Design a protein with these regions (language model features):
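Internal intein/HINT superfamily modules and their associated LAGLIDADG
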Residues: 1-149
Length: 149
């Protein structure tokens, strides 16, 4: 419907039509973990879409952490990123997208981890998380020594 008073159109999407449209795009109805769904190919094949997808996944199911450990009597703190999901294809899709951008990640059961400082910096630079808490933590980490003692 065209509005005559302004240069704009009104678009109305009903629930059924919208769901059918999303299904045509390759998305599925229902529990994503039970169905073990990954990221649709049309998203993975477009760099902009895949980056937006990774950003959204990280912002909802990702996090940052400090890995503290001892070596030769000295306590060290290292920074890391993590993405967690019980959906194996989703983890795999997330990892694929990172690899396309040259970011190394390591998996363990339901988690992916990014440990290298350069890769973490690249991650924040490329994917531009909307959760600035993680960016602030990383900057704080960079301003310190990795030794904790």
């Amino acid at each position: 419907m065209k509005r005559r008073s302004v240069n704009a159109s009104v678009i109305i999407v009903t629930g059924v039509n919208f769901v059918e449209y999303l299904m045509e795009l390759g998305l599925k109805i229902g529990n994503k973990v039970k169905q073990q769904v990954g990221v649709p190919e049309w998203i993975k094949s477009d760099r902009g879409f895949s980056r937006a997808c990774v950003r959204g996944l990280f912002d909802t199911d990702g996090g940052t952490f400090y890995h503290r450990h001892w070596v030769n009597g000295h306590k060290y703190c290292h920074f890391g990123l993590t993405f967690t999901s019980s959906c194996k294809p989703l983890l795999s899709s997330f990892k694929e997208c990172l690899e396309l951008d040259g970011i190394r990640s390591y998996g363990e059961k339901d988690c992916l981890f990014v440990y290298r400082v350069g890769d973490i910096g690249s991650f924040f630079s490329i994917y531009k998380t909307r959760n600035l808490k993680h960016v602030h933590r990383f900057r704080r980490y960079l301003s310190r020594s990795t030794r904790c003692d």
